[in-house]
């Protein structure tokens, strides 16, 4: 913790007021990053009229959750008690929003009637799946880039207007 306090240029006492342990600090930091990513995604789609365009933009920003901002914490997160529950909470919220956008796309007749929950689970889980250490080694690109490629393929495949 003293190394972290030194790097952040805050007192150790201040750091312990923020989080009582390194593990809690990491969980709080990742929680904040994921919350900010969600806020950014919602802000980006608020003025977009097409549900499918919203979905594309929302998932692109959501896939940033496995980008450089969180990469440095990957190994630590897998070891920290409570971290997976926090990640699951954010991922479940992400999947619910994707499901909602898919339902809106059906109502807007941008896509055919589909099992929106099944598709939402795939779109909302790709990035986390690709961020697993044993999977990262097999990818030709970063988890974020790979997740965006697959997400784009799926969304284009769903679209009634093939691009």
Indicate where each model-derived feature is located:
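Generic hydrophobic, amphipathic alpha-helix propensity
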Residues: 4, 29-33, 37, 98
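Short coil/turn helix-boundary motifs
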Residues: 22, 47-48, 69, 161
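Hydrophobic alpha-helical connector segments
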Residues: 28, 39-68, 119-123
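C-terminal peripheral helix-coil segments that are non-catalytic and often amphipathic
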Residues: 57, 64, 96-108, 124-126, ...
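Short secondary-structure transition hinges
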Residues: 63-99
């Amino acid at each position: 913790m003293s190394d972290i306090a030194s790097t952040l240029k805050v007192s150790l006492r201040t750091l312990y007021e923020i989080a009582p342990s390194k593990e809690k600090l990491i969980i709080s930091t990742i929680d904040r990053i994921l919350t900010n990513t969600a806020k950014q995604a919602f802000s980006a789609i608020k003025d977009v009229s097409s549900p499918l365009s919203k979905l594309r933009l929302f998932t692109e920003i959501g896939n940033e959750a496995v980008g450089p901002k969180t990469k440095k914490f990957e190994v630590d997160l897998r070891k920290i008690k409570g971290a997976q529950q926090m990640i699951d909470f954010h991922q479940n919220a992400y999947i619910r929003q994707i499901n909602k956008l898919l339902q809106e796309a059906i109502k807007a007749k941008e896509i055919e009637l589909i099992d929106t929950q099944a598709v939402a689970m795939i779109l909302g889980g790709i990035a986390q799946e690709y961020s697993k250490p044993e999977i990262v080694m097999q990818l030709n690109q970063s988890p974020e880039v790979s997740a965006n490629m697959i997400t784009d393929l799926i969304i284009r495949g769903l679209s009634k207007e093939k691009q």
